[in-house]
Amino acid sequence: MWQEIEGKRRTTPSRMMVSIFQMEDLTATMTRLTGEFRWEMCRRVQGPRWNDVSEPSLTSEYCDYIQFYKKNHELTADAKDKIKSAMQKAKNSYKEMFVRDYITWIMYEGNSSPRLNKVARVIIATYCPFSKAIRDRLMVNPMYKEMLEKYNLKMSQKVHHIDNLCQKLNNTKIEIPEEILNQKKF
């Protein structure tokens, strides 16, 4: 169980609760909980446009991928069959489908064991990236290399933007907020 915000104030910290008498694997439970939280938080932030492809987000791109997987030329026939059966197992729930892919992403793909198809991997990697240490380890694998190079390029552009912002703040003798420095480190 989780709570992404308290009431109408969106700046409150989230809460996640787990049963005291946990019978399942705690890692799997927390991974599932985090996946559900990411999905719902994205929906909360996007508001009514959570599945509108004109505003790229985790939920919009993932819903688009699931809705139009039959027309996607990047997927093989076998991958399309797997998506169809996975959707039946998830009872046609985009959220449940994402959570299952997220668990696979964290548990297997993070250990260089590819299980997801290319399209799902790119979407999840874009919005749910691994830490720097795991990304560096995955960079050796050719399956992840191109995707991670694009991610690194995108992040270097953001870092450049943050550097420019820090320079402007230094020139005006304003203290740089800790959040900006933390974003730069990530």
Task: Locate predicted features.
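Active-site-flanking segments in enzyme catalytic domains
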Residues: M1-F186
